[in-house]
Amino acid sequence: MQEQYRPEEIESKVQLHWEEKRTFEVTEDESKEKYYCLSMLPYPSGRLHMGHVRNYTIGDVIARYQRMLGKNVLQPIGWDAFGLPAEGAAVKNNTAPAPWTYDNINYMKNQLKMLGFGYDWSRELATCTPEYYRWEQQFFTELYKKGLVYKKTSAVNWCPNDQTVLANEQVIDGCCWRCDTKVERKEIPQWFIKITAYADELLNDLDKLDHWPDTVKTMQRNWIGRSEGVEITFDVQNSDEKLTVYTTRPDTFMGVTYLAVAAGHPLAQAAAAANPALGDFIAECRNTKVAEADMATMEKKGVDTGLKAIHPLTGEAIPVWAANFVLMEYGTGAVMAVPGHDQRDYEFATKYSLPIKPVILTAEGTAPDLSEQALTEKGVLFNSGEFDGLDFEAAFNAIADKLAAKGVGERKVNYRLRDWGVSRQRYWGAPIPMVTLEDGTVMPTPADQLPVILPEDVVMDGITSPIKADPEWAKTTVNGQPALRETDTFDTFMESSWYYARYTCPQYKEGMLDEKAANYWLPVDIYIGGIEHAIMHLLYFRFFHKLMRDAGMVNSDEPAKQLLCQGMVLADAFYYVGANGERNWVSPKDAIVERDEKGRIVKASDAAGHELVYTGMSKMSKSKNNGIDPQEMVERYGADTVRLFMMFASPADMTLEWQESGVEGANRFLKRVWRLVYEHTSLGDAPALNVDALNDDQKALRRDVHKTIAKVSDDIGRRQTFNTAIAAIMELMNKLAKAPQEGEQDRALMREALLAVVRMLNPFTPHVSFTLWQELKGEGDIDNAPWPQADDSAMVEDTTLVVVQVNGKVRGKITVAADATEEQVRERAAQEHLVAKYLAGVTVRKVIYVPGKLLNLVVG
């Protein structure tokens, strides 16, 4: 065995062994308990970042541990390979998205291998290949036939100069990111999947997810947003038209002072013909971003349409305003406004001098002061005619019943959740498999024409999708008729909604899933990824699973039993202010820092002499130039060190602060483990361990070894507190480093201890563990070795610590044999100097003894 720990030599050797032996390839085996460990698949951006490394290290630790428990462990990997960044990069690098993507996949694949992750590479998939997306296309056509897919017009961000649709992130300050033209809202036809048909099940089944974080479940509950309310119809004065609104607060109905409709509402559009101000306002609303978050923060504006609606219970004529905060695609495109009891309605009414009518009393039973804000709390009604004196629930029912009796109101359950718009007017995505025949009939692409293949050999102009720019691509023939293909592509959330299931049968050619394989592996036992995916991806992931279940492909209701959301990786961030007042961010590795005695940064500069502003730790990002390249760290310290630091520096679900001093500490620890194994093996083969021949010191050390095994097993397996597991191994190593290796049983015990340490470290640091296991002559490869078992008999304490009190006050602590009698404990206590002092010249009147824990002597 070589004396020095040289990770660069051993890691490549061990990785080659895994590749040649196909160590982590698995097949279905009914005789073994399965365990499916999955980390969210990466987007092939070009290089791994530390967030990836943390995510995949956590997954690999869990997978390797479960494998050592004897389970049949599936840990696959693939590439979420479609998406907008590839289009931008292709234009910038004068290439097409496909070669850019495949080059990145190859590069990142080598990076993943360099980190020693135990993936079943035979199952690798890339979502941009027709072999993958053909099944998604076929499934979509089946959903269409079931009535779960439909087309309707929906608002998008439109650049009138480039004549193209922009994603929300391509709209900068209301303008196109490319040509700076003012962006408009435009209604275009798009495809939708009816996720709302599953809203109740998606909501109710959250209760089955006992091992998902509560934060994620709460976010999904709020996103689905189930509410119970009343849909109310208003007649429009001097017209046959009607306006329908939905409210969850019918108790405030007598306080309605105006209605607000979307700029795109048919009534507003019609009224604009005779109202130029309204026409201008509708045109202005076309320049509003379509993201809901933007709607919430923008200035609320409106114009009176001149129309009046009739309050169904009071007969009062109420003004109808067009407002930019009402969206046509949300609900009915109209809302009732109660400015006395809704803050948004209040601000709008105040701005435009609309009436404000209070109808709910304060908690003290007085009329509310509405001079500064609305009273939004529920309470008892007043100013509401026959409904005065009713509380929220009674008023809700009474008003709902009265409206229903008049035929103008209906109780309804509503959802905040909207159907999933899956159309994207982009190139780099899976083509939507729909066609329009010459006679105008819209239908799914016939099965024998699937997949609809995206051409990869294209020229990107950065404006129009190549398949939209090429009229020939869309031309096809269906049922003997000329037809045009859909030129929109799928939202990339489509691919990431079912990849986990395809991993169970990636080579299967008869359909989307091989049901036998899928139902052997599914559901996923643990899914690991960032909490930023809580609503979009994780909701679509659950939805798709239910769609596949209802198509008879999977048996379970939910895709993953446990969800672990890893924390972000933070690093120091520094900048200096440039000549024009701009911030120039400097990489932490280029910062020269001074620290105080507590290690805090007090001053920083760079090589060019700029004085740097230290902003503290923040998420590693390109914008702050504070990312640390994992490859650089692996080349400097080895993959095992990087992995160990990642798992030790912080609990898995908390943020991790990148500190190179911590990485150095992890490296020193692995050198110590190597050194101890080297010293042990250089003494020759150890004899067999004879437990009965151990002296007290040896028994105590063996007790520590087995207590550590028990703790580490619990920390990794049940608690998933990996940092405390590593801390326990480090503590044991400190004891082993001081243990003698002279006697035969000393060496036998050391071998038992080191074999346990190396196996406990194996999930974290697999390369060095593999090598040291061989040096210790462990049986077979460590990859097939069982997890160490704690010996209960070794953990039994020979001695115990008893607290001695005199008249209830602690006067000493004594160590006695675990099986000592009360008499022996009293004798031993009397020998303690301090205890003896308090017993001198007094009589012991009473003795309270809690065996093995406490002796209280009552004296007088």
Curated annotation (Swiss-Prot):
Enzyme class, UniProt record, top EC level: ligase
Asked if the record carries the keyword Methyltransferase, the reply is: no
Superkingdom is: Bacteria
EC number(s) from the headed UniProt entry: 6.1.1.4
Q: Where is this motif: 'HIGH' region?
A: 42-52
Localization of this protein:
Cytoplasm
- Which Pfam families does this UniProt record tie to the protein? Anticodon_1, tRNA-synt_1, tRNA-synt_1_2, tRNA-synt_1g
What is catalysed by this protein?
A: tRNA(Leu) + L-leucine + ATP = L-leucyl-tRNA(Leu) + AMP + diphosphate
Entry's Gene Ontology cellular component terms: cytosol
tRNA-binding among keywords: no
Q: Give an example GO molecular function.
A: aminoacyl-tRNA deacylase activity
Q: Where in this protein would one find the motif 'KMSKS' region, according to its record? A: 619-623
Q: What residues does ATP bind to?
A: K622
Q: Name one GO biological process term.
A: leucyl-tRNA aminoacylation
Q: Which UniProt keywords apply?
A: Aminoacyl-tRNA synthetase, ATP-binding, Cytoplasm, Ligase, Nucleotide-binding, Protein biosynthesis
Question: What NCBIfam families does UniProt report for this protein, alphabetically?
Answer: leuS_bact (TIGR00396)
Q: Which family does it belong to?
A: Belongs to the class-I aminoacyl-tRNA synthetase family.
Task: Please identify the protein, giving its name as recorded.
Answer: Leucine--tRNA ligase
Which source organism does the UniProt entry give?
Answer: Cronobacter sakazakii (strain ATCC BAA-894)
Q: What is the lineage of its organism?
A: Bacteria, Pseudomonadati, Pseudomonadota, Gammaproteobacteria, Enterobacterales
Q: By which gene is this protein encoded?
A: leuS
